[in-house]
Amino acid sequence: MKLLNSIHLYPPQHTCGAEYMAHWINKDIKANGGDVRVLLHQANHYRINSMYTYDGIDVFPPEEMVIERLLTWSDAIITHLDYTDWSIGIAQVFKRPLFHLIHNTSTYQRIVWAEDPQYIIYNSEWAKAQLNYDHPSIVVTPPCDWRHYDTNVDPSYNEAITLINLDENKGGHILRQIAEALPHRKFIGVTGSYSEPADKGQHTNQPPNVTVLPKTPTIKDVYAKTRILIMPSKYESWGRTATEAMCSGIPVISSGTPGLRENCGKAGLYFDREEVKLWVDQIEKLFNPKAYEKASKAAKIRSRELDPMASLERLRNFMRQSITDHKRKA
């Protein structure tokens, strides 16, 4: 299998959940005998003007001759988000099967209207139920390998309550309210690679007890200092950082969107994001050793239940069979 990613941005510069989902799928395909390359459409966003290799994956800026060579080289294309429309068009021109990584529940009309071969990879059962595109599909939750993300640090010795991405949707303004209500506690706020809504930006103006850190490709360093992860998100189709944190036994307090509930299951602690006092009270409860031990154990168990190896194997088989079927019909 020779898989071409047709996407806008990629790690290590762009550190969002969608890009890391793509990257872990790419790594798995390559580790199991396939080959993967990334066409980086918005390379100029980070002033990238030459090919680079990240974690074994080759990434190419969109030079005209390079684009044609990559498309000719490929057996199939995978895309998501910003370059869905472009990829549908170019896949038809080059007669390649196209796989769509679905990270949210917004309907993409071009996917609805697109002629076969289109294949859908939903990031949650909830997203599949909401969208139900009329194309062959599979559900693969964002791969978070606990063997990689477990910091092997006992989080009960940590002090920080952490929020990753300080935009409006993720609750950067709510972090401020919680931190102001708990001046005796320490907080970490990590800025994100994007802001939703964009015009509101990142809420970096935080109280003195909040350490604001820049976005980082080494998020484990943050988890190694984290006692509790908070996710007061308005919208979250899955919430990858919750899974990552649970790998180290870090309890997650979240707003309980359908995606977060599917992700965290019984290990999650859920509150309306506008009820700040409930968040404050729950944080204080988790400084009780017995309460923390129970929540931490549940988080770690849940992360092991989400072991991605079986679902990644199912995805490889789904993609290989889809490519084989396409070649047979061609």
Pin down the residues of each PLM region.
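Short alpha-helical donor nucleotide-sugar binding micro-motif in glycosyltransferases
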Residues: 71, 215-216, 221-226
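Donor nucleotide-sugar binding/catalytic pocket of nucleotide-sugar-dependent glycosyltransferases
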Residues: 118-150, 157
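Conserved catalytic-core segment of nucleotide-activated headgroup transferases in glycan assembly
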Residues: 146-206, 212
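Short acidic/histidine- and often glycine-rich active-site loop of Leloir-type glycosyltransferases
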Residues: 222, 257-270
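Aromatic "clamp/platform" in nucleotide-sugar-dependent glycosyltransferases that forms part
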Residues: 234
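Short hydrophobic beta-strand element within catalytic cores of glycosyltransferases
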Residues: 251-254
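Conserved acidic donor-binding segment of nucleotide-sugar-dependent glycosyltransferases
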Residues: 268-276, 284-290
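A charged, aromatic-enriched C-terminal amphipathic alpha-helix characteristic of glycosyltransferases
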Residues: 290-320
